[in-house]
C-alpha cells in the first residue's frame, strides 16, 4: 500500500521505528518549543498532507510513553484522517499530567496507523418491529462488573 504525502520544507515522512511497528511516527512541525500546561489542549501541525487510498483511513494514536510518563494524550483518540481529506494533518494533544510538557521541534508526537474502512448501509426500522433481542440488551457502561 502506498500513501502519497505532500511535505512542507524540512518535514520528514512518517516512519516506522521498528520492523514490526503498526504505527508510523508523526513529528511536530514547529519552529520553537511549545509548552503544554496541565489541563491544556493544543493543536500541533505535522507539515504533512496525505492522499489515502479509498477504502482506508489513517488513525492518529497517542505514543504510549507520553501517556505513561507525562499524561500527554491525543484527545480524540484515535483521530481519523479520511481518504478524501487533503488538508494538513494536525494532532490535538492534551496534558492530563501535573506538570508543563514541552513539545520540541521535530519531536515524535503521535503515531499513524493505516486501517481498512467499511462503509455500512444504515436502515431505519419501525420501533414496533424493532431490533433483534440479545441477552445483553441495552446494558452498557460497566455492566459486566469491575473484576
Swiss-Prot record:
Q: Which cofactor does it need?
A: Mg(2+)
What catalytic reaction does the record list?
dUTP + H2O = dUMP + diphosphate + H(+)
**Could you tell me which pathway this protein works in?**
Pyrimidine metabolism; dUMP biosynthesis; dUMP from dCTP (dUTP route): step 2/2
Q: Enumerate the Gene Ontology biological process terms.
A: dUMP biosynthetic process; dUTP catabolic process
- CDD domains from the UniProt entry: trimeric_dUTPase (cd07557)
GO MF assignments: dUTP diphosphatase activity; magnesium ion binding
SUPFAM superfamilies for the chain: dUTPase-like
Binding locations of substrate = 63-65, 76, 80-82
The EC number(s) this enzyme carries: 3.6.1.23
The cross-references to InterPro entries, in alphabetical order and at most eight, read: dUTPase, dUTPase-like, dUTPase-like_sf, dUTPase_trimeric
User: Record's superkingdom?
Assistant: Bacteria
Q: Which UniProt keywords apply?
A: Hydrolase, Magnesium, Metal-binding, Nucleotide metabolism
Family classification: Belongs to the dUTPase family.
What does this gene product do? Answer: This enzyme is involved in nucleotide metabolism: it produces dUMP, the immediate precursor of thymidine nucleotides and it decreases the intracellular concentration of dUTP so that uracil cannot be incorporated into DNA.
State the name under which the record lists this protein: Deoxyuridine 5'-triphosphate nucleotidohydrolase
Q: Which organism is it from?
A: Chlamydia abortus (strain DSM 27085 / S26/3)
Q: What is the lineage of its organism?
A: Bacteria, Pseudomonadati, Chlamydiota, Chlamydiia, Chlamydiales
Amino acid at each position: 500500500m502506498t500513501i502519497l504525502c505532500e511535505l512542507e520544507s524540512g518535514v520528514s515522512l512518517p516512519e516506522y521505528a521498528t520492523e514490526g511497528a503498526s504505527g508510523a511516527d508523526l513529528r511536530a512541525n514547529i519552529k520553537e518549543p511549545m509548552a503544554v500546561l496541565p489541563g491544556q489542549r493544543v493543536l500541533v501541525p505535522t507539515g504533512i498532507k496525505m492522499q489515502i487510498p479509498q477504502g482506508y483511513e489513517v488513525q492518529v494514536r497517542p505514543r504510549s510513553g507520553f501517556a505513561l510518563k507525562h499524561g500527554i494524550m491525543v484527545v480524540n483518540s484515535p483521530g481519523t484522517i479520511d481518504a478524501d481529506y487533503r488538508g494538513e494533518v494536525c494532532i490535538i494533544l492534551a496534558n492530563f499530567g501535573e506538570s508543563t510538557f514541552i513539545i520540541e521541534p521535530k519531536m515524535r508526537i503521535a503515531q499513524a496507523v493505516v486501517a481498512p474502512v467499511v462503509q455500512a448501509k444504515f436502515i431505519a426500522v419501525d420501533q414496533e418491529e424493532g431490533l433483534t433481542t440479545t441477552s445483553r440488551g441495552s446494558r452498557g457502561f460497566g455492566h459486566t462488573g469491575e473484576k
